[in-house]
Each structure stands twice: as C-alpha cells, then as structure tokens.
Amino acid sequence: MSTILKASAASFALLSLGHTISGREWTSDKVFKNIKGSRSWACGTVGWYQGSAFLFISGILHYQWSRDPSLLQDPLNKAIAAIINVLLWVSSSWYVKNGVTPSAVACGFSAALQGFAVLKEIL
C-alpha cells in the first residue's frame, strides 16, 4: 500500500468537502440569487456540485491506486492521473487570478501532493 497515494486520496476527499461548502457559500450570495431560475444559475449550480462529485471520485480512484500502485503502470491510469493533475493546477491558477486564495492554495497543495505521489510510483 502506498501511504503517499493514500494521503493524496484523503486530500481529494477534503477538496470535495471544501468545494461543496464553498458552493453553498457563493450560491447564497445576493448577486447569484438575483439570477435564480436562469440558465446561468442552473448550469453554475449543477456544474459546481458535479465538480464536488468529480473530486470525490478522484479520491476513490487515488485510494484504489494506493492499494495497488502497479495500476499506475497502465497508460490509461497514467493519462487519468496527468489530466487530474493538470486540472488541479489550472484550477489553482484560475483561483489566484480571481482572488480566491483559499481555493488556490488548496488546489495547488493537492496538485503538488498528487503529482509527487503519482511520479513516485511510476518512476
């Protein structure tokens, strides 16, 4: 079992929880409530919670990899790990650009941890 991949899995579970809580905060903002019922409101809300589910699923996947790190030798699993890492770094950069520092730090930390964990197992 890989402890570092297990730590990465835990970081995704925490990201998912934080993402969900953050969604509850910004969807209660007066500006956002003013567009309730619009397409932007519907897509923004469902998309946000789909993101939370994606982060949770990523945590489960990383937990599976922690139980059997040899799975990361498969090219498809490598590709999935790479896409997840790029997504985290891009999200972190987007949050920095838009002044959402706590989310930027959380995504950046998880990206670094995930990248290190995966590289440690495949190199």
Predicted region positions:
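Perimembrane loop-to-helix junctions flanking transmembrane segments
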Residues: 32-40
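Well-ordered alpha-helical segments within folded domains of soluble proteins
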Residues: 57-59, 104-109
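Juxtamembrane transmembrane-helix termini
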Residues: 22-32, 64-71, 98-101, 120-123
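Core segments of alpha-helical transmembrane spans in multipass integral membrane proteins
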Residues: 14-26, 39-67, 82-86
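Interfacial segments of alpha-helical transmembrane regions
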Residues: 1-13
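Membrane-helix boundary connector in multi-pass membrane proteins
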Residues: 87-106, 116-123
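Portal/gating segments that form or line small-molecule/metal binding sites
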Residues: 61, 65-98
